[in-house]
Amino acid sequence: MNEYSKKIIQKYFPSINKENSFELTSQKKWNEKFFNIDYTILDNNSTDISDELCNEIKCLKVSDEGKSFSLLKKYLDKMIHLHTIELPAIHLEKIHKLPFPKNIKTLKIINDSKYNDYFKDNKKNFTANKLLKNWGLENISCFDVIHLSNAKPIEDFIEISPKHFPNLEFVKFRVLKSVDFLTQLCTFKTIKHLTLGGVLINVFPLLKSFSDTLETLRFESCNEEFTLKGIEEFHKLESIYFNSIWNGIDCKCFLELPKLKEVVIMNSRDIINIESVLKLTNLESLYLADNKDEEKKNTINKENRSKLEAMRIPHIFIG
């Protein structure tokens, strides 16, 4: 990972440790977990959270049970140093009732398969009355929708706008075949970093409005319908990341991206023209790992491995 990526991660996802990160949940639910080194429990059966403790909280993970939501309504605005909050998706319908502190930068929505029936039962309502519509936080720079286990996508039920998220720069979500949420994002002029999961369509024509602003682009778990056609228009890209791409990656397309500093390809199939990477003059970081061809052999042959490893770039890993 080069210095560019490190700065991005630190900006939107600051380090989590037990001194500043808490999970608002019940003691019973906490004890059911095997081990959690990153968070300190904040028992939602408590009737009071001291001002001193509120001041310590920088990252808060909220459970979906017990008194978590009522405690948030009472104490959230006192957590003046809070920069990151993780909310269960089931709380989206009443998120407008929470008194968010001004310093918060990162909003993570955790969607779990146990909410599938809830969103299915409310599909008609949430389609007509979108979640987060006419709501937002001025200082939010990162919006992250995380799907756990077999959770069904909820992006079609969400509506956000530049008016209510004027400083949004980093967005992560699952695309599949839906274009509604992606179309909303195209109205933003501030977005610099996109992470797209489960892409089942030709997504680049829909991303054209980002061609002059997008600096990093990540694709995760995209199947045979995914294509890179159109990526050449994103000439300001500095980092490109692929994880679990099953439709092949032609590295020649990277030659159309002159500012590329970082290329990451992992757990993907049928990587061709890998030698094109040798011509990227601004490359600072290269990570190639666990990529297979049609015969499930390593995509990187001995000749290309030698050439790539001989590149004079600061950070390189070929596995």
Where are these regions (language model features)?
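Hydrophobic anchor residues at the C-terminal helix/turn of individual leucine-rich repeat
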Residues: 49-51, 76, 98-101, 134-137, ...
